[in-house]
């Protein structure tokens, strides 16, 4: 999973992710928006489910984060397609709507995101 964090012209933190993980970047941009309390909530939830078979989810306005001890899924809340009406050979581009990654990679990315934000504000 490759990613980078940037400041846009208005000073807001934005993220870009590699093709198979674009939904994670969109989730950060739309749901987290630099709010470290959200990252703390996720880290706390992961500590609670670690070593168990339980899942935890965080439903946002545009995206939902679902995680268990081993994997994280980010999906757009509107990710429902009717495939009956599609022409043969056609498929939807959903890379910005659905992404999976390992929990460790996700937590490492969130730590990098936190560091970027803290450097931005010199806290």
Curated annotation (Swiss-Prot):
Q: Name one Pfam family in it.
A: UPF0231
What InterPro entries does the entry give? UPF0231
Indicate the family of this protein. Belongs to the UPF0231 family.
Q: Which HAMAP family match?
A: UPF0231 (MF_01053)
Q: What NCBIfam families does the annotation carry?
A: PRK05248.1-3 (NF003576)
Q: What is this protein called?
A: UPF0231 protein plu3616
UniProt source species: Photorhabdus laumondii subsp. laumondii (strain DSM 15139 / CIP 105565 / TT01) (Photorhabdus luminescens subsp. laumondii)
């Amino acid at each position: 999973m490759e990613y980078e964090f940037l400041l846009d012209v208005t000073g807001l933190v934005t993220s870009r992710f590699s093709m198979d993980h674009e939904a994670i970047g969109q989730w950060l941009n739309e749901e987290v928006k630099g709010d470290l309390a959200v990252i703390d909530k996720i880290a706390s939830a992961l500590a609670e489910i670690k070593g168990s078979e339980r899942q935890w989810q965080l439903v946002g306005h545009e995206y939902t984060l679902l995680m268990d001890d081993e994997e994280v899924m980010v999906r757009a809340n509107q990710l429902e397609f009717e495939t009956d009406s599609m022409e043969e050979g056609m498929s939807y581009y959903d890379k910005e709507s659905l992404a999976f990654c390992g929990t460790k990679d996700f937590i490492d990315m969130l730590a990098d995101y936190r560091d970027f934000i803290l450097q931005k504000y010199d806290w």
